Amino acid sequence: MTPTLLSAFWTYTLITAMTPGPNNILALSSATTHGFHQSTRVLAGMSLGFLIVMLLCAGISFSLAVIDPAAVHLLSWAGAAYIVWLAWKIATSPTKEDGLQTKPISFWASFALQFVNVKIILYGVTALSTFVLPQTQALSWIVGVSVLLAMIGTFGNVCWALAGHLFQRLFRQYGRQLNIVLALLLIYCAVRIFY
């Protein structure tokens, strides 16, 4: 990979990992509401699911020259529905101001999000088909880059969770407003899938 292509790869992956999306918003919300320690199950579920999805993206990118548009369209609708459900859960979740104690979303729920998270699927397919496959079809490289993509994504999730933890006091003071803003951002993510 040339230095120019490598630079473009890092720029694409880091910007994509650090911009708002379902995972980052969920990580921020969970750490704000429950603290970083209580959110580690959420982050672990995201990380494992992210890795598996990146490996699946590698298989898809490697095996298929063109992805079936009907399958992508169906996946987009499933992803949008799940993201809207997450938005509803965040918008209606009790805050510390409400005096109710809640548990963070489960490991398995955050794990399942990855399989309908269109942002990371497109992230994986785009990175692999744009930066890796034109350079090499070696399976070891494709799998290695898939693992790297999952690590970069996990880094973004942890950064957002740490932001939620560090600004927890401020976010808790305005918990209801924050939940509404985060829910609206998720709705925006769902709409952006189609436009």
From Swiss-Prot:
Topological relation to the membrane, as annotated: Multi-pass membrane protein
Compartment(s): Cell inner membrane
Cytoplasmic-facing ranges: 29-46, 91-104, 163-176
Topological region Periplasmic: 1-7, 68-69, 126-141, 195
GO biological process, one term: cysteine export across plasma membrane
Transmembrane residue ranges: 8-28, 47-67, 70-90, 105-125, 142-162, 177-194
Pfam families: LysE
Disulfide bond recorded as keyword: no
Recorded GO CC terms: plasma membrane
Keywords annotated in UniProt: Amino-acid transport, Cell inner membrane, Cell membrane, Membrane, Transmembrane, Transmembrane helix, Transport
Catalysed transformations (reactions): O-acetyl-L-serine(in) = O-acetyl-L-serine(out); L-cysteine(in) = L-cysteine(out)
Domain of life the protein comes from: Bacteria
Principal localisation: membrane
Molecular-function GO terms, alphabetical: amino acid transmembrane transporter activity
InterPro entries recorded: LeuE-type
Function in brief: Exporter of O-acetylserine (OAS) and cysteine.
PANTHER family cross-referenced by the UniProt entry: ARGININE EXPORTER PROTEIN ARGO, ARGININE EXPORTER PROTEIN ARGO-RELATED
Family stated for the protein in its record: Belongs to the Rht family.
Protein name: Cysteine/O-acetylserine efflux protein
